[in-house]
């Protein structure tokens, strides 16, 4: 009896550990307009480095996701692509344990209605913190800001927040999806 129970536990535990994380529904907000780009975010506490990792490729820096420009977009999103946000390896002591609690995203290439429809948009992502999956996020197919909130994570130097594209809304012309802006929220 004990061997059977042990065997069942050995078979069941990996499946339980691999269970899908909680699903967060993004909240659709106000329109994205150039005049309102910028403002306070986690960047008020410290900067971070953003990179894209496409399947089978090395990381590539991405500068368009937090450039406060509604006319630029990262246009290489495909299922399996990852975005990584690495916090500085050295932070002043008082900035360790800075609250990080979500992000705002302008999904798609929102430069115009026509361009928005031509590119795909990200439909669902999986969020990771230091390599551990903690949530999936469902995004709406809209040109408006979308807000994603989760329980506070106390960010520390060298930490890495990342997201993997799980699903996309197809574009009419291009096979890839786009993201215009992605702003990490926290610090206060």
Per-region residue spans from a language model:
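A short beta-strand element within beta-rich, extracytoplasmic domains
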Residues: 95-117
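Extracellular and analogous surface-interaction loops
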Residues: 83-101, 152-156
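Trp- and acidic/polar-enriched beta-sheet ligand-binding modules for extracellular glycan
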Residues: 20, 38, 42, 79-82, ...
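Sec-dependent N-terminal signal peptides
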Residues: 7-9
């Amino acid at each position: 009896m004990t061997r059977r129970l042990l065997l069942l536990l050995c078979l069941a535990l990996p499946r339980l550990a691999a269970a899908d994380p909680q699903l967060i529904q993004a909240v659709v907000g106000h329109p994205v307009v150039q005049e309102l780009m910028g403002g306070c975010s986690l960047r008020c506490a410290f900067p971070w480095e953003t990179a894209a990792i496409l399947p089978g490729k090395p990381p590539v820096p991405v500068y368009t996701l937090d450039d406060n420009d509604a006319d630029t977009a990262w246009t290489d999103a495909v299922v399996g692509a990852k975005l990584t946000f690495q916090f500085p390896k050295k932070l002043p002591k008082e900035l360790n344990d800075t609250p990080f609690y979500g992000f705002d995203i302008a999904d798609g290439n929102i430069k115009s209605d026509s361009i928005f429809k031509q590119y795909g948009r990200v439909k669902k992502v999986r969020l990771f913190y230091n390599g551990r999956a903690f949530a999936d996020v469902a995004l709406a197919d809209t040109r408006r800001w979308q807000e994603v909130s989760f329980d506070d994570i106390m960010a520390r130097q060298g930490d890495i927040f990342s997201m993997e594209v799980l699903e996309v809304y197809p574009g009419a012309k291009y096979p890839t999806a786009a993201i215009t802006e992605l702003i990490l929220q926290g610090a206060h």
